[in-house]
């Protein structure tokens, strides 16, 4: 996702405050939950993104629905600020920017593993261990099914691509056979 500069600024400020209080991972989880909640309820999203609704009403709604309900004061204050500035539309970008900044500080590299079929938990663990060993970095992988793959996996992590798909093996075999035939 493309993240605006303003979203990066909000995320950086929120991370700085959250780190001071030692709640940076909690804040990350809260941001993700809020983004998911907004995506799941279009009427709530439309309410907060509607410029015709005054910021006072939005602030009151934020405080009434989140204050004292397990959401950190830092996240509530950020949402209040977004309501004041009529910038609720960048909440998802702030969440992504926050995650990226947190990953950078914790030395985490994210990646995606695509496979034709769902991978068993032990296969996922094995893949993570092998990629961690090769890159010598802490990694977090997400797994996706790709019906275009005949079999095997394709992992893209931190600018690296590990392609162990049947498609690639067949291409290499074809190239080798053509090379030997000539």
UniProtKB/Swiss-Prot annotation:
Residue ranges crossing the lipid bilayer per the database entry: none
Subunit and interaction comment: F-type ATPases have 2 components, F(1) - the catalytic core - and F(0) - the membrane proton channel. F(1) has five subunits: alpha(3), beta(3), gamma(1), delta(1), epsilon(1). F(0) has three main subunits: a(1), b(2) and c(10-14). The alpha and beta chains form an alternating ring which encloses part of the gamma chain. F(1) is attached to F(0) by a central stalk formed by the gamma and epsilon chains, while a peripheral stalk is formed by the delta and b chains.
Main subcellular location of this protein, as a coarse class: membrane
The protein's name in its UniProt record: ATP synthase subunit delta
Family to which this protein belongs: Belongs to the ATPase delta chain family.
SUPFAM superfamilies: N-terminal domain of the delta subunit of the F1F0-ATP synthase (SSF47928)
GO CC terms in record: plasma membrane; proton-transporting ATP synthase complex
Function (record text): F(1)F(0) ATP synthase produces ATP from ADP in the presence of a proton or sodium gradient. F-type ATPases consist of two structural domains, F(1) containing the extramembraneous catalytic core and F(0) containing the membrane proton channel, linked together by a central stalk and a peripheral stalk. During catalysis, ATP synthesis in the catalytic domain of F(1) is coupled via a rotary mechanism of the central stalk subunits to proton translocation.
Subcellular location: Cell inner membrane
Native organism: Bdellovibrio bacteriovorus (strain ATCC 15356 / DSM 50701 / NCIMB 9529 / HD100)
Gene3D superfamilies: N-terminal domain of the delta subunit of the F1F0-ATP synthase
Keyword set includes Cell membrane: yes
Topology of this chain in the membrane: Peripheral membrane protein
GO molecular function, one term: proton-transporting ATP synthase activity, rotational mechanism
């Amino acid at each position: 996702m493309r993240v605006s500069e303003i979203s990066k600024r909000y995320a950086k400020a929120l991370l700085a405050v959250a780190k001071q209080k030692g709640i940076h991972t909690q804040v990350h989880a809260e941001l993700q939950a809020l983004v998911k909640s907004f995506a799941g309820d279009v009427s709530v999203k439309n309410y907060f993104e509607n410029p015709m609704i005054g910021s006072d009403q939005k602030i009151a709604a934020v405080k009434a629905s989140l204050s004292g309900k397990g959401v950190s004061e830092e996240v509530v204050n950020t949402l209040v600020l977004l309501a004041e500035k009529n910038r609720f539309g960048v909440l998802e970008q702030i969440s992504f920017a926050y995650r990226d900044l947190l990953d950078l500080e914790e030395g985490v590299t994210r990646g995606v593993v695509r496979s034709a079929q769902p991978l068993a938990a032990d296969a996922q663990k094995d893949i993570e261990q092998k990629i961690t060993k090769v890159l010598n970095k802490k990694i977090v992988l997400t797994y996706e099914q790709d019906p275009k793959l005949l079999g095997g996996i394709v992992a893209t992590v931190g600018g690296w691509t590990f392609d162990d798909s049947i498609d690639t093996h067949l291409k290499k075999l074809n190239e080798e056979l053509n090379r030997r035939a000539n």
